[in-house]
């Protein structure tokens, strides 16, 4: 058992018989009273995401997650297929369970599969990924003065705010923790 104050983004825990993954966590201190933990959590089996508030002293059951190196292969209907790099065994996972990660997946990308017992419950992405810009506005002269950036759609469908010099066809490096532009590839 661990206290909710010890939970971090990406951790899996069990509460009320459900396996839950922390997607986002925020410590909130109201004007009066005790600190609260505001969290976005995902049921790893159904894929549903819920915003919840817990007391930092609440206890939850931490779940042991086993990790295996894998490669993303392809999508088939509503499932994504991954291959274990050691055994070459293929695993399928419902796309609703990896809705956030799906925005960054490209064919043959290496990831880590997360298992609880023998059940695939999610994937972990590398810290950064290289994606291709498929649609963005052309560069406007003098746009670098304000430094605001412009939206760009990647080959995976992800929309990233990029500097004004980025154009269609460019490959860029994107941070997977927050979806922010990092640099040109």
Swiss-Prot record:
Involved in peptide bond synthesis. Stimulates efficient translation and peptide-bond synthesis on native or reconstituted 70S ribosomes in vitro. Probably functions indirectly by altering the affinity of the ribosome for aminoacyl-tRNA, thus increasing their reactivity as acceptors for peptidyl transferase. Signal peptide: none annotated. It comes from Limosilactobacillus fermentum (strain NBRC 3956 / LMG 18251). The keyword Ion transport does not apply. InterPro entries: Elong-fact-P_C, NA-bd_OB-fold, Rib_uL2_dom2, Transl_elong_fac_P/YeiP, Transl_elong_KOW-like, Transl_elong_P/YeiP_cen, Transl_elong_P/YeiP_CS, Transl_elongation_fac_P. Disulfide bonds: none annotated. Transmembrane segments: none annotated. It is found in: Cytoplasm. CDD domains: S1_EF-P_repeat_1. This is Elongation factor P.
């Amino acid at each position: 058992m661990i206290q909710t104050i010890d939970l971090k983004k990406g951790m899996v825990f069990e509460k009320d018989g459900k396996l839950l993954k922390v997607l986002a966590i925020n410590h909130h201190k109201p004007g009066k009273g005790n600190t609260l933990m505001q969290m976005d959590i995902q049921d790893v089996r159904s894929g549903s995401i819920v915003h919840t508030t817990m007391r930092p002293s609440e206890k939850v059951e931490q779940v042991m997650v086993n990790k295996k190196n894998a490669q993303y292969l392809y999508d088939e209907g509503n499932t994504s297929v991954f291959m274990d790099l050691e055994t070459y065994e293929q695993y399928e996972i419902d796309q609703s369970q990896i809705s956030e990660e799906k925005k960054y997946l490209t064919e043959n990308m290496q990831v880590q599969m997360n298992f609880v017992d023998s059940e695939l419950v999610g994937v972990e992405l590398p810290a950064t990924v290289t994606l291709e810009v498929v649609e963005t506005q052309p560069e406007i002269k003098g746009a670098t003065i304000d430094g605001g950036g412009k939206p760009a759609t990647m080959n995976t469908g992800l929309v990233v705010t990029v500097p004004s010099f980025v154009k269609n066809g460019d490959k860029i490096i994107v941070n997977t923790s927050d979806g922010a532009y990092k640099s040109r590839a």
